[in-house]
A protein has these predicted regions:
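Flexible "stalk/tail and boundary" regions
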Residues: 1-10, 14-17, 23-85, 89-90, ...
Length: 138
């Protein structure tokens, strides 16, 4: 199973590009899947998922009550902002301004591996998120 593990710091350059950490790039390349980004529903961050996870998510939406407003809101919240990312030869992709505003990222960022996906957060928010998460298990 391919997984996104560990945490890495990075920056957004003047052209709004971020370089994906090499181990994450390797996971994406080895998966041979498309890669998608969207606004997290849990935190002020961006989530990056492979197409297999997105397909699984869409399938789960389709298996739920079609007329459920809750299901419809969930689909809208995720799928209306979902975007495929294009990774260049240097392993970078562009983070659109609307995603930067939502996640409060500007220059320094952190990539946090979550197994089947990874999150991109503003560095200080990400460091704090990791600290809070660890404290929950003491």
């Amino acid at each position: 199973m391919l997984m996104f593990l560990s945490s890495f710091y990075g920056i957004i350059d003047s052209k709004n590009r971020v370089a994906i950490p090499s181990s994450f790039r390797s996971t994406i390349k080895n998966s041979k899947e498309k890669t998608f980004i969207f606004k997290s529903l849990k935190y002020e961050c961006l989530e990056v998922h492979l197409s297999s996870k997105i397909n699984s998510l869409v399938k789960s939406f389709d298996e739920k009550d079609f007329f459920s407003k809750k299901n419809d809101h969930f689909k809208t919240a995720i799928l209306s902002d979902l975007e495929e990312i294009t990774i260049d030869k240097e392993g970078r992709f562009i983070v659109k301004e609307k995603l930067q505003k939502f996640s409060k990222i500007s220059k320094e960022i952190i990539f946090i591996g979550k197994g089947n996906h990874f999150e991109i957060l503003e560095k200080k928010l990400g460091d704090n998120h990791k600290k809070i998460s660890r404290a929950k298990f003491k």
